[in-house]
Amino acid sequence: MKRCLTAASVILFFSFWMLRLSLAQEDADPRKWTVDDVLKQEFTGSYDISPCGKWVVWVKTRPDKEEDRMIADLYLSALGDSTEIQLTRGKADDRNPKWSPDGKYIAFISSRGEDKEAKDQIWLIHSRGGEPWVLTSLKNGVNSFEWRTPDKIVFSAREDPYFYEQELKKKKDDAIVVGDQEHFLPVRLFEVSVKAKEVERLSMNQGRIGEFAVSPDGQWVVTNEDQNIHYPYDNRIPPRQFLYNLNEKTREEIFTEKRMKPYDYVWTLDAKGFFCSQSVSSDPDNDYVSVATLYYFDVTTKTYERVPLNWNWELGYGYQMTQEGLLTSLANGPWNKLAFYQKINGQWERHWLEDADSKNIHVHTVGKDGRTAIISYTTASVPPRIKVAKMQDRHLQEQRDIIKINPWMNEKYIAKSEIIQWKGAKGDPVDGVLYYPHNYEAGKRYPLMVSIHGGPAGVDSDVFRESWGSYPNVLASRNSFVLKVNYHGSGNYGLKWVESIKGHYYEYEVPDILKGSDYLIKKGLVDPDRLGITGWSNGAILSIQCVIESDRFKVVAPGAGDVNWTSDYGNCAFGAGFDNAYFGGPPWERPDYYIKKSPLFKMEKVSTPTIIFFGTNDTNVPTEQGWEHYRALQQIGKVPVRFILFPGEPHGLRKLSHQRRKMEEELAWFDTYLFQTYEKPNEAFNEDSPLGLALKKGKVKKTDGWYGEESNGVLVPEVVELDSLWIGRFEVTRVQYAAYKKNLQFKTGTENYPQNEIDFEEAKAYCQWLSQVTGKKYRLPYEKEMRKLIQKAKGNVAGENNLDYWAGYAITPDEATMLLPKIEQLENGLLLSVGSFKPVGKEPVYDLGGNVAEWCVDENGQGVILGHSALTPSDSKTLYQPPHLKYVGFRVLLEKE
């Protein structure tokens, strides 16, 4: 029996995709976005303003390489002068901070401590700082909490393990009973005293309390209580809502009408009622596909009413209670629309927020005074600016930046963006967010990557977002357009739009996407022969269908996308709810329809190289969907296919290492089949090895064996870009300096040594001469620039020409003094040829951590010596002392026009 290899299986035999796949293609320009940039972003959130209105506590989420995940810390910022204080640190996630009503404490949720199996508990920290302490110690942990009084906190939690659970644990019985409604164990309300640490049970409900909200006066609690273990799957038996009177210890069911299942409760400032969201659908029996509208509940009359929004697209991104009414975000496509709603003399009134930038403003929280707000301003081309503002006369007044995040983005290219519109599948307008190539030139055509959002009821907004799932600036750095499409079925466009694909799945979305690329081709922006498409979740689902219906795409990268709706029905965590809504019933009632809608049965039409991503623990889009997709393409053997699994990951990737691998694999695929710039890395080659360093050094400019380049017949220093500075690759060498100082004498063989024993005025004079000779503007680095460069080389100091190198060990200050007599016996001292040690930067810069210390200019124009020299120990605990001039030199900086 003969065995043959298909094209797809041959591709799989090659290992040229492993690790560092895209790194070979990263341009040396530090302003371009890289995978590292995406992963080093920090994020802010969970803002809570102090009762006095002078402070805000918030959460910064930061990447931790050692933990391989994002970690959340608490911060405190003054609203007056933006003073920033870090309250917590470590390896635990500290989240959901809330001020006590008297402003004395901040409570938060955390599993901090040495026990890796620790559950989430309520922790407290004094508002003036200090060490946090744990308030609760429940065996099953705490779900969420709210302050009731300065001494009382209401929280939701499970009871301690029941005897049934304890017995299973003793037996090491970890079998799972699927759909075990009998053991759908309740989540209840409890109250804990700050002073006494005593816990009191407030409810005996049998359902699971998910969301709850405590009234400002501490008398009332409104709850959502899940009733059925199958509800997330089939959307049948919904949660029930209850109103607790904590003073009278009563509980009353509210919102008892059919289909009423409100959520997102916000109390009025006077505690007389609350607002909430409610799903609205045209289907009287199934509201799985819906939009949200606004209701108001009066606690005195126990009645509720729908608030007339007078806005066809209904609610958008939530709401906040203010002195001027409920500040509400209304659905507005890719933007925001902010309005106040208030009942005056029995009539609801709407007034718009008056701000020229309101469509790009998001209100995160409003203080207890109903006026102080934390807001952010962002567009697809403007990273979020976090501000404090005062609400007065329906304006956001006294806006001021208070929290600065990711300042390094100021030194990065940010792609130009715009909201564009074209005619979609039904002849109606479709919106998209278009990102331009970083080096865009009018009249030229560029590649296009279509990046599709999930949902389907998600939305791509005019906000800045760069993530492992979608990274438009990384692609713009590869000189590509990126288009995000708000296809039929997307959210934030009203009920008609979101419901339009019920019974028409794929039929409108795919044409919307294809017509978007047609529009850009027709405008002369995009090269029709260089199109790619990618997406995660529903974005992957639509990407897969697009390459079935069209052969225009040169590459497709679906992550966590369905191909077989029949198997999805039983394996997806919400399979019945989703599939019944969009496909009109279960597969046993509509088998032919399910097959018709499943891309799996059309895989022979695919002609696009495909890379597939999945987490092994994904239940939103079950992992076996990836296997079915991969096996079909692999067995058909028509196109290259690659399948990447991420162990332990759910629907979204959590580990930083997995996020990195996903992006690097994806970019390598794009570089190969779309951009055609991919170069296979040598898996045996270590860039930091002596061989790697020698190869790097071999690319530097030389003239007659001397470092530098010729300009107007004169040998001058070579400059390269490092962190947006055009800096000398080496310290100015003796032979370079000799071109300026004609009578300079030095020993043969030391031409490439750094010029030493130079004072400040001599270094400045050389820069002036160099400027005259070349017609370019050279100078010494400013002190702040030099410190930035030294910081860049901090991790390199141990391997540079400093005293530790000559001693052969990490030398102490005492030992350095003892070693001086030995050093004086060396005829040429400790200096070596520039570039003798490991550099920093992709376009390498040498000797920032040794050889000679270097002159720079302080803010007063005076000379300052900074940096390590061959005579300097690397000991960071010693106060820096400049070395003798024998070990002082300089390097030049070129000012680019």
Protein language model features and the residues they cover:
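A short glycine-rich, aromatic-capped structural motif
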Residues: 702-747, 751-762, 768, 850
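Non-catalytic accessory segments flanking enzyme active sites
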Residues: 46-48, 154-156, 163-165, 182-189, ...
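Active-site-proximal cap/loop segments of hydrolase catalytic domains
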Residues: 471-474, 484-693
